[in-house]
């Protein structure tokens, strides 16, 4: 099953500026973890914002789980796209406990099922003992795990991660990368990881795509990762 399909996507911050993303096409299958590499300003983070519905393209089509979410005459709101996001700063609510941070994204789930889902997510990221803690009481790696649990809790079709390791020191980054790959594959989660660090994609991704001046891609310029 194709989980994300993008055709001829073009985006500019204004009509007077050159496109940040120009005629970009791409597809990925369910369960794949894809890395997006590129220099600053190449449109990596903008691509995630377009997929999630936080930006509107000039032209092009995006499908998520075979549902069209944007094209010339259609725009599905972000909350109805089945997309989960983990941001660079994790965006946890400081006044909420770990449990309440995860519960926040489950408002559409029947109340009787919410506690079970929180418990499942805490077990998945191995943070069961931190359920009553607040974000400021957690390390950077622990905060990232909770951000991941919150993003996965509503069962999104696709998870988007924007520079998820940039706030971690080198030693912690290496261990967290390994943990993240295990968690994503255990959850059979399709994921796009934006990063400037090739080591990130080599550690967890099935293949990578480099965004550059033309921002055009096809199957021939994907680089598939080799995992032990």
Sequence positions of predicted segments:
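Conserved ABC ATPase signature
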Residues: 134-138, 142-144
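Catalytic Walker B motif of ABC-type/P-loop ATPase nucleotide-binding domains
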Residues: 159-163
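ABC ATPase NBD coupling module
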Residues: 69-84, 108-111
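Helix-to-loop junction immediately C-terminal to a conserved catalytic motif
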Residues: 52
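Conserved ABC ATPase "signature" region
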Residues: 67-70, 112-130, 181-182
């Amino acid at each position: 099953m194709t989980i994300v399909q993008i055709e001829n996507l073009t985006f500019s911050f204004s009509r007077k500026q050159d496109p940040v993303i120009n005629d970009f096409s791409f597809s990925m299958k369910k369960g794949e973890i894809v890395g997006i590499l590129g220099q600053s300003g190449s449109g990596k983070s903008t691509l995630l914002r377009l997929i999630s519905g936080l930006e509107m393209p000039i032209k092009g089509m995006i499908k998520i789980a075979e549902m069209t979410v944007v094209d010339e005459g259609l725009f599905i709101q972000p909350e109805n796209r089945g997309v989960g996001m983990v941001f660079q700063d994790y965006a946890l609510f400081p006044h909420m406990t770990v449990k309440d941070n995860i519960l926040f994204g489950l408002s559409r789930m029947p109340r009787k099922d919410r506690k079970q889902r929180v418990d499942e997510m805490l077990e998945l990221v191995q943070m069961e003992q931190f359920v009553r803690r607040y974000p400021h009481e957690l390390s950077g790696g622990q905060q990232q795990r909770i951000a991941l649990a919150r993003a996965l809790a509503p069962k999104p079709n696709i998870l988007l991660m924007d520079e998820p390791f940039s706030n971690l020191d080198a030693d912690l980054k290496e261990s967290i990368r390994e943990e993240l790959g295990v968690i994503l594959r255990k959850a059979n989660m399709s994921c796009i990881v934006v990063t400037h660090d090739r080591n990130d994609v080599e550690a967890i991704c099935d293949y990578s795509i480099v965004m550059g001046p033309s921002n055009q891609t096809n199957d021939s310029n994907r680089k598939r990762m080799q995992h032990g």
